């Protein structure tokens, strides 16, 4: 019902009268978003889609007199397309175009506050999921992005032509700093490029951060001297405050570590962008862990798809980002994983619905982020990992290194031999999909460490249906 009062039409109007504009053609400067939307029973999808556009831009639940003080046509979000989700009842893809002026330059925090803010609690919606974002080049150019990127990292490490190898030190909690450093040393001297703090290692009573940093750096320097290779360990600088985080980063730089680590979701995008800018200024690589992501991205009809988080992290800044494995213990659909892996490291990615890429994305030469495959992987997975992720990736074996029956160093050697054998076989034109197991068995004949690993894990599989599929 509308009433005439104070010179404007007060009251409540359908959102679609203002925010549903199917004739609108998006501009190159618009930020585009695709939502998977489940309306409440009886609510038209166009009205729901318009509500999403309104509540994530300029709208509110009623007409307000201050609408007349601005140009709504210039600033409002516009739902320009609604289409049913194939194979799903009462689910729709809703495409919204947002004017560039709605977003602060260089702020991932501001973009997400608008797109995934109050609108996700809207009563007319049973569920809502942000599937993809197209960042316009004009906005991309306001972000620093990764501190260094894949090419610069390879130059700093002097490692080319193969994936990098890593390992998360286990047990994740409870080791003293000296024993932790010893485990790092054994893994690095055995053939790994990196070792890693687990995401929940910060500065607990059993191992304070400064002690860990010093013993780990000793392990790095000792293993480098023995192997004549550049080594590193992802020292987790995540802390309760940004000031403490930067203090730990400064200390890591002072002792000479090449790479540090941050938990970007629990730490927050503002803290992450701050740290990424510090890393570029100080020549330190930045490894990003995605702890908490499954709370946000695992449900198929509500939340945020990981491809959006990966895009946002690339803009916020990170040289590495965990991406799942497809073949390990953690959730990961192959087509969708390959889609967001490309969005992490390629400069230009074409729209491809078969891989979950809803928009063509031009990164305008922003450095790429290296995907990190980790979670329940071992030597038998090596051929599939090399084929799926290619050279510009980091393959991280935690239990698949430390669980070797002969210890950490032989476990690391087994992984390095398996990797080198798979890369050589691929370069010789052999199919890892068909001949991968044979490649590993052949290499195991002259590597007792690999042979022992192959025997130990020959029966281990993680065969569960993927929850989030395309």
UniProtKB/Swiss-Prot annotation:
It catalyses: 2 (2R)-3-phosphoglycerate + 2 H(+) = D-ribulose 1,5-bisphosphate + CO2 + H2O; D-ribulose 1,5-bisphosphate + O2 = 2-phosphoglycolate + (2R)-3-phosphoglycerate + 2 H(+). Its cofactor is Mg(2+). Binds 1 Mg(2+) ion per subunit. The disulfide bond which can form in the large chain dimeric partners within the hexadecamer appears to be associated with oxidative stress and protein turnover. GO terms for biological process: photorespiration; reductive pentose-phosphate cycle. Its main location: other. GO terms for cellular component: carboxysome. It comes from the Bacteria. It is found in: Carboxysome. The keyword RNA-binding does not apply. The modification N6-carboxylysine is found at residue 196. This is Ribulose bisphosphate carboxylase large chain. It comes from Picosynechococcus sp. (strain ATCC 27264 / PCC 7002 / PR-6) (Agmenellum quadruplicatum). The gene is cbbL.
């Amino acid at each position: 019902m509308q009433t005439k009062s104070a010179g404007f039409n007060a009251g409540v109007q359908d959102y679609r009268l203002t925010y549903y504009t199917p004739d609108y053609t998006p501009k190159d400067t618009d930020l585009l978003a695709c939502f998977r939307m489940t309306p409440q029973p009886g609510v038209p999808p166009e009205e729901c889609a318009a509500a999403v556009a309104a509540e994530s831009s300029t709208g509110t639940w009623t007409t307000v007199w201050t609408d007349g003080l601005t140009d709504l046509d210039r600033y409002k979000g516009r739902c320009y397309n609604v289409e049913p989700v194939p194979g799903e009842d009462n689910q729709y893809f809703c495409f919204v175009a947002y004017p560039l002026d709605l977003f602060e330059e260089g702020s991932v925090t501001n973009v997400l506050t608008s797109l995934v803010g109050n609108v996700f609690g809207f009563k007319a919606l049973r569920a809502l999921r942000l599937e993809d974002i197209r960042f316009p080049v004009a906005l991309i150019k306001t972000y620093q992005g990764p501190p260094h990127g894949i090419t610069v990292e390879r130059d700093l490490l002097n490692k080319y032509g193969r994936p990098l190898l890593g390992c998360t030190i286990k047990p994740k909690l409870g080791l003293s700093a000296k024993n932790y450093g010893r485990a790092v040393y054994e893994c690095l001297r055995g053939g790994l490029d990196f070792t890693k703090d687990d995401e929940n290692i910060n500065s607990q009573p059993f191992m304070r951060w400064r002690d860990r940093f010093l013993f780990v750096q000793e392990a790095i320097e000792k293993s480098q001297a023995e192997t004549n290779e550049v080594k590193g360990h992802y020292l987790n600088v995540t802390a309760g405050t940004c000031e403490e985080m930067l203090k730990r980063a400064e200390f890591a730089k002072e002792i000479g570590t090449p790479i540090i680590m941050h938990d970007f979701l629990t730490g927050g995008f503002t803290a992450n962008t701050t740290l990424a800018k510090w890393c570029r200024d100080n020549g330190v690589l930045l490894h990003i862990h995605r702890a908490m992501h499954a709370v946000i991205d695992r449900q198929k009809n509500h939340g945020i798809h990981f491809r959006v988080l990966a895009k946002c992290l690339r803009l916020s800044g990170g040289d590495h980002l965990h991406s799942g494995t497809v073949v390990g213990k953690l959730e990961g659909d192959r087509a969708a994983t390959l889609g967001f892996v490309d969005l992490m490291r390629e400069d230009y990615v074409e729209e491809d619905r078969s891989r979950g890429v809803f928009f063509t994305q031009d990164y305008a030469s922003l450095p790429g982020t290296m995907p990190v495959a980790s979670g329940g992987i071992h030597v038998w997975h090596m051929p599939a990992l090399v084929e799926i992720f290619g050279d510009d990736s980091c393959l991280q074996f935690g239990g698949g290194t430390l669980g070797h029956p002969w210890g950490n160093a032989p476990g690391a050697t087994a992984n390095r031999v398996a990797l080198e054998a798979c890369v050589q076989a691929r370069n010789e034109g052999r199919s890892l999909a068909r001949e991968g197991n044979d490649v590993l068995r052949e290499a195991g004949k002259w590597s007792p460490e690999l042979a022992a690993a192959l025997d130990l894990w020959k029966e281990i599989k993680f065969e569960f249906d993927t929850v989030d599929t395309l």
